Amino acid sequence: IVKASLWRNPAMRGSILNAGYISNADSATMIEDCAAWLNGGCGLIVFPEGTRTVPGQTYRFQRGAAAIALAADCVLTPVTLTCTPSTLTKNLAWYRIPPRRFHLRMEVGDDIDLAPYRQMQPHSIAVRRLTQSLLDYFTEQRLRYEQH
């Protein structure tokens, strides 16, 4: 999923189209396109907080990831990415190289059971509750990471 402004960037547009990215210009269309993509057997990576966070600040999640998962009726697997030392964050210029080589770590969590959320009505409440569950999960992961 790519923010709509990048689709208008002449330097990026061709790469975005060729890579098969989905635009976030219209949320309803984005959710439909993502659900169709998942139901077609493809995978999808969604960063509910956006692609780059500011270290030390609390997460602010968008509801798109939850809305997509519920619309596609798919498996939702949380993945935590950590980077030491911190680099490529929103408050740091991309060309600022860390003083030592950085290491990326990926931790794949257990699948999240969506059945309880599918039963909630209205749908908007289910999306909000699932988003909150994701926020709680990743906040706990961040705290666990920061303690080590």
Predicted segment positions?
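Short acidic active-site motifs
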Residues: 30-34
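A conditional alpha-helix N-cap/helix-loop micro-motif detector
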Residues: 24-27, 58, 127
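Membrane-interfacial terminal anchoring regions of lipid-handling membrane enzymes
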Residues: 84, 107, 115-148
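Catalytic core of membrane glycerolipid acyltransferases/transacylases, capturing the structured
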Residues: 1-27
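Active-site glycine-centered loops adjacent to acidic/histidine catalytic or metal-binding residues
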Residues: 49
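A cross-family acyltransferase "interaction/gating" segment
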Residues: 10-13, 36-43, 54-121
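Short histidine/acidic/glycine/proline-rich micro-motifs that form metal-
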Residues: 6, 52-53
